[in-house]
Amino acid sequence: LYEDGHMTKRCQGNQVRCGVAGYFDKTAGLECRKVHWSAANAKKHEGLEPLAITISNHMKEVSPKTYEFQKSKINKDYIFKDSIFSTMTINYDYRTATHRDKGDLEGSLSTLTILEELEDNYEGFYTGLPEYKIMFDIRNGDTLIFDAHEFHSNTEYIVKSKELEKDDMTGQPFAGRMAV
């Protein structure tokens, strides 16, 4: 809202601690390439490869058809080494509104893996699929395999400990939850 009372056509969401590692798709005449973070942090990018392999192995075990489908579609030059994944989106302590993911491989499933800096440091943060009226309590090391093109979200959460640093934006202590 402007000072004179008329509405702006812009909107601003809350700032989110998130990042992308891996590779961009080919777009607007640009070839596939590493995202800036991965290009600038080659050793850290390589450090994510064991996690990508572990998540790939979960997919292979739980949904072998999806694993083989995704494997048939990948370009081996643009993946985390020895995995089926080209990209990792990383969200820290972030509650999402109900949404559908875009940009993922159509006809495939997605993974959501939780890593906790301090185990059992929060209550809530359930991942929900509202159309199916189901929620999951995904915890440290767990991987959920689901269709992220379906509506999904996660719930509010309460941080139990003040052991971790505080968020500069909110002043609240971090839960220490990373969703990959």
Please name every model-derived segment:
Residues 152-156:
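Short, ligand-facing micro-motifs at secondary-structure edges
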